Amino acid sequence: MARQVEILGEMFAFVDFGETSFFDLPCVYLMAHEQADQIHIHYAGQTARLKARYAGHHQLAAAKSLGATHALILVAPDARDRREFETLLRWHFRPPLNLEEVPTHMQAWRAAMHCGKHDVALRAKAAHLGQAQPVQASVFTQSRIVRG
């Protein structure tokens, strides 16, 4: 089994950038690298075909210059599911290479409800009501790594 990491309750697989051309799958993906026991997230996206998307990705060179070495992928066949989960990832991590505005707390709430992520929806709602600061750094400790 390939290495995996749990992110927002889902298991993402580690895929070296050089191997993305072998994955002709619909997925949500993160451009990332590991340093010590942390994973640094540089970009979050979604695509109907990973192989085609990575071939000429507009942020791949920038991600590599920041140290990114691999993609973290979650296969997601449904287009709406991919878009909503990408919204959650951009809200949660605020990756520095995503040029779009960070989703609002209510956009994150709607995306979380669609994806069945009620704990994330509660955080987004609390942030919207001014009860919490949801800012999550684009770096996290990989406490739930599954190594195969």
Write out the residue ranges for each language-model feature.
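Boundary/linker segments flanking structured domains
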Residues: 1-42, 46-148
